[in-house]
Every structure is written in structure tokens, then in C-alpha cells.
């Protein structure tokens, strides 16, 4: 919390792979205030999520999707993960970073990609700005 600006100020794209909501909210809020691109990957058990937010272009944010920390917050240490899932999430995240660097429009921008390693299922969910979002005045 005390050094996020020092770490992030020189980077237009921020990658998040943290496994707790407090840190995700901190990174989300920093990126939206500073108009950064945030590419976030999260995994748990057999499932993964990938977010691609471009806060330069009026994107919804992580708080729009999840306004509060769930009371039953889980993490990789307590629940475990399918080991190949970490590689999948990292590869998908890296792919989104490369597309952002090359200014290639991504269908994932502003959306949530949900993937399941047991069934090899992939779904894309359109994220909308939440009118009650804590960051609604920063969305543009």
C-alpha cells in the first residue's frame, strides 16, 4: 500500500496475479486512478479468471464485478490449484499484455474470461459498469 506508486508509476500496463482481494482492490484502485491498463489473472482449484481493464478508455473495474470481499474468501494455499492452471492463466495473461503493447484490439478488454481446466471450458462474460461502484466517478 505504501509503495504502489513507486512500483507502478513507470509502467502503462500492470499485471496482477495476487490471490487475495485486498491486494486486488488496491491494484485496481491504483490503476483506475492513474489510467493504466490492468490485466489480472486469478486461479483457484480447477477454475481461472482473466480480466483485461483499460482505464484509459472508460472501462468497468474489478469493483464493478465484485463490490465487496466475499465472506468466504478462499486462496490457493487453502484450496489448492490444478498445477497446469497456473501456466494457462499466465499464458493467457501474457498474451493480453503482448496485444496491449502492440495495440491489437482484444475481445477480452472490459470482459471476464472464465476457464475451467477440468472440462477445458472457456466462457467470456461482458462486464458492465456498476452504478454503485466505489470508483464510479473515476470510470469516465
Please place each PLM-identified region on the residue numbering.
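Glycine-rich phosphate/adenylate-binding loop
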Residues: 2-140
Amino acid at each position: 500500500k505504501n509503495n504502489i506508486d513507486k512500483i507502478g508509476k513507470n509502467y502503462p500496463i500492470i499485471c496482477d496475479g495476487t490471490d487475495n482481494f485486498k491486494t486486488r482492490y488496491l491494484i485496481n484502485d491504483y490503476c483506475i486512478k492513474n489510467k493504466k491498463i490492468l490485466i489480472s489473472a486469478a486461479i483457484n482449484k480447477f477454475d481461472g479468471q482473466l480480466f483485461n481493464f483499460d482505464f484509459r478508455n472508460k472501462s468497468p473495474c474489478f469493483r464493478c464485478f465484485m463490490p465487496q470481499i466475499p465472506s468466504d474468501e478462499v486462496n490457493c494455499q487453502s484450496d489448492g490449484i490444478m498445477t497446469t492452471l497456473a501456466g494457462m492463466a499466465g499464458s493467457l495473461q501474457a498474451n493480453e499484455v503482448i496485444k496491449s503493447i502492440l495495440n491489437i484490439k482484444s475481445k477480452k478488454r472490459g470482459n471476464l474470461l472464465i476457464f475451467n481446466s477440468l472440462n477445458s471450458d472457456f466462457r467470456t462474460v461482458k462486464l458492465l459498469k456498476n452504478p454503485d461502484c466505489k470508483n464510479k466517478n473515476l470510470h469516465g
